[in-house]
Amino acid sequence: MKISVILPYKENFSSEYAGAVSLQLKDTINLSKYKKNIKIFGYTTFKQNILKKNYVNLSTKKFFFQSTSNVYIRNFLDHENKESSNLIEIHNRPNYVKNIYKINKNLVLYFHNNPLDIKGSKTIGERNDLIKKVKKIIFISDWTKNQFLKGIDKSFIKNKQLEVISHSTNKKSISFKKKKKIILFVGRLNKSKGYDIFGNSITNLLNKFPNWIAIVIGDEPRENHIFKHKNLKILGFKRHNVVSKYFKVSDISVVCSRWNEPFGRTALEASSCGCAVIITNRGGLPEASPYAIKINKLNSRNLESNISKIIIDTKFKKNLQKKIYNNFILTNEVIAKKVDQYRSKLIKS
């Protein structure tokens, strides 16, 4: 028995710059009852730091005028022709469905981003065609599912073929007494993530509250936002296991995205570590941390005001941290079971 998981081309299934999809698969496959039957197909240049042994790095060598994506899929199909799969799970690339469907019709399609922004699911016709072809479509959040359903027949709203299975993480063992006066920002240091607004707010806050520090983890080579303060530490990119340690000891985590986050891995991780989480009310972010403070209108003043409230009111901060932590339910165990439930049904059918 074989289950094939195909990643988007360039999804880095490695501890170096691992994306949210890679982290999710690593954690849930380890807990799957089918873990010995699963093969992951992808492409990365970081071959020394692969996250799992059952990974196949597909060749992308091409000739002139060939699409790298087409070469990538063709190489996957070569593997499939040699040893066919009982089930194929396609992640975040609806345009892969057409070619894979020709040789295997037991397909599951995952959406980790807004379907309306992805090649192969932008139009109503494309989305209707996907519903006809694949056995199941999995969405990272209700928000991404609702985006997919725009213009689709209302009968599909409660159709079991379309299911929300969120990302997950381990609920960390923490001590609230060991939390430190740290304001944490994790993510790409760009305007989409609201880093420019965070930077402007944080320098003012650190002047007002000199016994607090701010830590920034992440990078962004395409944008350059420079903020300096003696209590502001910018660490650059760090591996996931290192980032988790900072979440565990930080009092406050800020996820102030401008764009509609499909879900919000950072908010999820912060919640699992009992941070007082501040998010923008955008996209699927509220689903990642339902009890977080939500900012409806993002600007430096509003962000600064909400962080200040947590800093000044210690009782409010502690209650918020415990409420977020105690109500955290999106564990890897829960999500791995949900995934295995549909696998069992589709393999038997």
Label each PLM-derived region with a short phrase.
Residues 276-279:
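Short hydrophobic beta-strand element within catalytic cores of glycosyltransferases
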Residues 4, 138, 175-193, 199-202:
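Conserved donor-binding/catalytic core segment of Leloir-type glycosyltransferases
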Residues 292-301, 309-315:
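Conserved acidic donor-binding segment of nucleotide-sugar-dependent glycosyltransferases
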